């Protein structure tokens, strides 16, 4: 999970900083690789994954009503997803008032930077915790996303 620090957290001077939180479960007391394996089993069983921007998108606030509408479209099966530029396996949901930027050099650079942050986190994590390192597949998938953005 990549998120911004908020003033609700007990941290000094880091508000609005982009950070990686390796899990969304604050009660996890076991190695992260166990969550990774569980998620892989879910996806292998046919479960779909959706990432929803619930705070803001490209600097524009996303209201709770819009978030709920997006969730309802997914649940109802009416969401019409489109390919997300050159990134294989990534799709997006068009939403009025929230246009997808053109995949020009600047936008690709932004996405590459954000994906590189994630990749750097995984590489550092695996170096720091070699006994419970995440599988190479997690890293190679991010490397593939970065390659897709080079074209």
What are these regions (language model features)?
Residues 1-151:
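Conserved NTP phosphate-binding and transfer environment spanning the P-loop NTPase/kinase superfamily
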